Design a protein with these regions (language model features):
Chain B
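Conserved ABC ATPase "signature" region
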Residues: 63-64, 111-129
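Catalytic Walker B motif of ABC-type/P-loop ATPase nucleotide-binding domains
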Residues: 159-162
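Conserved signature/switch motifs of ABC ATPase nucleotide-binding domains
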Residues: 133-136, 154
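Helix-to-loop junction immediately C-terminal to a conserved catalytic motif
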Residues: 48
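A short, surface-exposed alpha-helical micro-motif characterized by mixed small hydrophobic
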Residues: 201-203
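Conserved ABC transporter NBD signature motif
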Residues: 56-64
């Protein structure tokens, strides 16, 4: 590329081309990472205590933030739903409206976003620091698979924790909706919960359940991958953490749209 | 016997290793020396299988490391010990758990047997009192000794040391060297020791290899390296500026004091 004219033309073209190439390369690496994680998930032995430890961290550790966000989401839904429904004289449907919104959409999505922010980022930072301080290399040198010790337990814990946290989010959200709609605005408990059970069925619960499982897998996949492949130093780890949170959040929303449109 | 043959490795188009070759005989410890940033740690990580070469081969008793299946590589690694530059202790575990970890995961020993072996190893490295401490609570020297205990707990046949004394004071450096020497005599492992502690490491290694510009430029006994005619090697081990640079500086109008240039260290 000695010719200056050639340089002027080729350099921008190469820069443009590098973006999709990097993107495709990263997709491939993420795909291989997932394949390896799945392989070790089904190849015994399973590190049971590490799974429990991660469930404690991802699941139990996120309960407070899930309860708080669930309560306030339900309360906001109670307010907004009541004033919207009162315009058409249908405040009796507040219960079904709050329940269906939470069970099918808001519960799985918001719970997953909260877990991404609280636990996903921490998983990425922990793996990134372990990568930088050669702790992951130390595992490999001992003849132990980092996937079996670090990645698979996080995957399983996330798959178990996120649906349970979503369930907590839904229950607290429905109660929050009742607190506002019922206690403050006067919808009776019988109407609120009676109409809810009439309109929200098991299919709605299952729809949210399937979504939350997918989101749990997504969070673990992205967080572990970004941490495992984190760059050098504090900057590398902080960039990996930011990317993990942003990518997980975006993928959760895209996945939610796809699941809603194709499956339910 | 470890044979490293014509190793090449590039990172982002920069060639770090350009055909490095080395042989380590059974029971020998080879000190790998050379200027910073020349790829000594990269070389060591290839020997351990943590990095794959672009080309070249690594043989253990005739077995090609690059041609091994994953299960064979895992089996081979159980014969390895690796002392990382910063220790690489698991920071969520105590010193005791760090040292016990390889035994718990790779052997069928009872917890009582593991305890006996771990305490004996910690005693050997002078950390009997620190078993309940976490890596963050250890000094640099203690962390290195704990990492050494973890690396040696399964009596490896091959030990790789990546700058085990970097950032430590001279007394701790001496004690770590003594520890490596005594464990080498006790366990009889073969090994490669990346170090900048020249000439201290020459006191207990059998061979010295000099990595320069991506190739092993010199291999010989500690005595032979002092007698070599290779000016680059000679300048390096005497801590002088490279001969070429020195000649250039002698031609400039003002006289450059070499000791001043090196921060006043004689």
């Amino acid at each position: 590329m000695g010719n200056p004219a050639e340089k002027w033309i080729l350099t921008p073209v190469r820069s443009v081309g590098r973006i999709p190439l990097d993107w495709v390369g990263n997709m491939g690496r993420m795909g291989l990472f997932l394949a390896q994680a799945l392989f070790y998930a089904f190849a015994p032995p399973l590190k049971f205590f590490r799974v429990l430890k991660q469930i404690r961290f991802i699941g139990f550790g996120s309960v407070t933030v899930i309860v708080l966000t669930g309560a306030f989401t339900g309360m906001v839904l109670g307010f907004q739903g009541y004033y919207t429904l009162s315009r058409v004289g249908s405040t009796a449907f507040l219960g079904p409206m709050v329940a269906l919104s939470l069970l099918r959409e808001l519960g799985p999505v918001l719970a997953a976003l909260m877990v991404t922010g609280r636990a996903g980022s921490a998983v990425t930072a922990e793996l990134g620091i372990m990568r930088n301080s050669e702790q992951i290399d130390a595992l490999e040198i001992m003849g132990l698979s980092p996937f079996r010790y670090l990645v698979v337990p996080t995957f399983l814990a996330s798959l178990i924790s996120v649906p349970l946290l979503t369930a907590i989010f839904n229950v607290v959200g429905i109660l929050g909706g009742y607190l506002v709609g019922g206690r403050l605005l006067g919808v009776s408990a019988g109407t609120y919960f009676g109409e809810m059970t009439a309109y929200a069925d098991a299919q709605d619960v299952l729809a949210g359940f399937y979504k939350s499982i997918c989101f749990g897998g997504l969070i673990a996949w992205v967080s572990c991958f970004k941490g495992y492949t984190a760059g050098f130093g504090a900057e590398g780890v902080s960039r990996a953490t930011t990317e993990a949170v942003v990518l997980s959040s975006v993928l959760i929303l895209i996945c939610d749209y796809l699941l809603t449109s194709f499956l339910f | 016997m470890i044979t490293i043959d014509n190793l090449h490795k590039s990172f982002d188009g920069v060639e770090v290793l350009k055909g490095a070759s080395l042989e380590v005989r059974d029971g020998d410890v080879v000190a790998l020396i050379g200027p910073s940033g020349e790829g000594k740690s990269v070389f060591l990580k290839h020997v351990s299988g943590l990095l794959k070469p672009d080309s070249g081969r690594i043989f253990f008793n005739g077995k090609d490391l690059c041609g091994l299946r994953r299960s064979e590589l895992v089996a081979l690694r159980s014969r390895f010990g690796f002392l990382f530059q910063n220790g690489a202790l698991f920071d969520s575990m105590t010193v005791y758990d760090n040292v016990a970890f390889p035994l718990r995961e790779k052997t069928r020993l009872s917890e009582k047997q593991i305890r006996e072996r771990v305490l004996a190893e910690l005693e050997q490295v002078g950390l009997a009192e620190a078993e309940d401490k976490y890596p963050a609570q250890l000094s640099g020297g203690m962390a290195k000794r704990a990492a050494l205990a973890r690396a040696l707990i399964r009596a490896p046949e091959i030990m790789l040391f990546d700058e085990p004394t970097t950032g430590l004071d001279p007394i701790i450096v001496h004690s770590i060297h003594e520890l490596i020497d005594s464990t080498h005599k006790r366990l009889g492992f073969s090994g490669i020791l990346v170090s900048h502690e020249i000439p201290e490491v020459f006191a207990f290694v059998q061979k010295v290899a000099f990595l320069h510009e991506g190739v092993i430029r010199f291999v010989g006994t500690p005595k032979e390296i002092f007698e070599t005619d290779d000016t680059v090697v000679r300048d390096f081990i005497r801590g002088s500026l490279p001969s070429e640079a020195l000649r250039f500086r002698e031609q400039v109008p003002f006289q450059l004091n070499v000791n001043e240039a090196r921060g006043g260290v004689a």
